[in-house]
């Protein structure tokens, strides 16, 4: 008998009919002789609606109280789903994050899981019950409810799978697996049968919406057997694993687009040691991640440094740098929020010459200008104007998945 952890996102549990469908999937898995732990997200737009309600009451509500409020969305999902499963004649129990033993740090709204006390879940499984767990939440050392931030339910599911030594962790979404690009916006996108942890991590980090990078990092660390599939189609999904059979044949596994990007340029910096350190240490102290970096040296012993941050961090980054203008000594600061990042990812890229050239040629042929470039062993990213982003993804995808024929 296998132990299977299943996770269902907000779109999968959005209304009564979809909840019944999720209950059917869970009970069918259980009837095959498996133990089942299912992690559920809040229904549809529930979390956004709760945030709006909070803003009406107090736009400056504390993060602790926001976590108390937002955690209720997932609790509604698990209790309704449990009622549905009960009505089908199965034994089931729903558990909030704290009841499931999900222990976190005290970073309200962005908590990290420290460990999981699995005794309660195991006790319920031993009673042959289906266990439903509220995703996205836990409890800290002060017995306060915390939420895990973006991707929290994915992370909850993978963490539970690791702690329970589950045989499989299935992530159910509204698409039936991991595609070479977003099938909702890119013509010709193909589903992948399998993908490596490293490739999935890069795609998740570069804007692919299927899995959150935190959950992929955890799955890789604990070697969790991971599968992404649709709660609607019933078709086989995509397996995410350490090594895939098709790796030697594959140059590029996917093309991702990220519009949550802003470009910041510091112009007229002194060309001397320590300047870059000063800039990026200031941002790091405030938790602002920097991605693509470009430095250019002028003829007048000055230099310019350009870099990208999340668009949501751009205003804060601009404020921090302007406050330290005298210490950093720059002539001008420019912020451009009308940009997007296009990335190609593939484990086979490192050993195949010409991949970057092919990407750049595709963009050139489409008349798209490249503003910045970043490369690693399995990823190439370029910054383009936001208005060109959709065309850029389509052009690059068309070139690779006809040129190399890989999927």
Where in the sequence are the language-model features?
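Short phosphate-binding/catalytic loops that engage adenosine nucleotides
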Residues: 34, 90, 224, 288, ...
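Active-site C-terminal subdomain of aminotransferase-like
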Residues: 224-235, 259
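Short hydrophobic alpha-helical runs that function as membrane-insertion/retention elements
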Residues: 168-172, 226-228, 291, 372
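Conserved H-loop
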Residues: 41, 231, 295
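Nucleotide/pyrophosphate-binding catalytic subdomain
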Residues: 1-216, 384-385, 404
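Acidic-aromatic/histidine active-site loop/patch
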Residues: 219
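A conserved regulatory-domain signal marking ACT and ACT-like small-molecule sensing domains
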Residues: 237-407
């Amino acid at each position: 008998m296998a132990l299977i952890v299943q996770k269902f996102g907000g779109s999968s549990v959005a209304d009564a009919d979809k909840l019944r469908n999720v209950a059917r999937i869970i009970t069918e898995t259980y009837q095959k002789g498996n133990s089942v732990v299912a992690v559920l997200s809040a229904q549809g737009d529930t979390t956004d609606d709760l945030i709006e309600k909070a803003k009406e009451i107090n736009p400056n509500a504390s993060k602790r109280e926001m976590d108390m409020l937002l955690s209720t969305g997932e609790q509604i999902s698990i209790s309704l789903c449990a009622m549905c499963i009960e009505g089908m004649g199965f034994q089931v129990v729903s558990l909030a994050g704290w009841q499931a033993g999900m222990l976190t740090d005290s970073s309200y709204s962005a908590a990290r899981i420290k460990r999981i006390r699995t005794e309660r879940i195991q006790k319920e499984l031993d009673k042959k019950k289906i266990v439903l767990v509220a995703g996205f939440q836990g409890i800290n050392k002060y017995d306060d409810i915390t939420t895990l931030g973006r991707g929290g339910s994915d992370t909850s599911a993978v963490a539970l799978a690791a702690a329970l030594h589950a045989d499989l962790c299935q992530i159910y979404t509204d698409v039936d697996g991991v595609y070479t690009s977003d099938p909702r916006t890119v013509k010709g996108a193909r589903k992948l049968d399998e993908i490596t942890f490293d490739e999935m991590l890069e795609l998740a980090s570069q804007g692919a919406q299927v899995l959150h990078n935190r959950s992929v990092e955890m799955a890789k660390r604990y070697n969790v057997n991971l599968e992404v599939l649709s709660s609607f189609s019933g078709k086989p999904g995509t397996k995410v694993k350490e090594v895939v059979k098709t790796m030697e044949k594959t140059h590029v596994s996917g093309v991702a687009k990220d519009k949550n990007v802003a470009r910041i340029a510091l112009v007229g910096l002194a060309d001397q040691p320590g300047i870059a350190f000063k800039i990026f240490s200031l941002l790091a102290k405030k938790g602002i991640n920097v991605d693509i970096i470009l430095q250019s040296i002028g003829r007048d012993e000055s230099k310019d440094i350009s870099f990208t941050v999340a668009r949501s961090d751009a205003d804060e980054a601009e404020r921090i740098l302007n406050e330290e203008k005298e210490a950093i000594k720059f002539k001008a600061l420019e912020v451009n929020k009308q940009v997007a990042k296009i990335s190609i990812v593939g484990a086979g890229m490192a050993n195949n010459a010409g991949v970057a050239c092919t990407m750049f040629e595709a963009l050139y042929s489409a008349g798209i200008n490249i503003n910045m470039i970043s490369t690693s062993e399995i990823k190439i990213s370029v910054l383009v104007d936001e208005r060109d982003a959709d065309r850029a993804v389509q052009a690059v995808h068309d070139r690779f998945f006809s040129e190399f024929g890989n999927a």
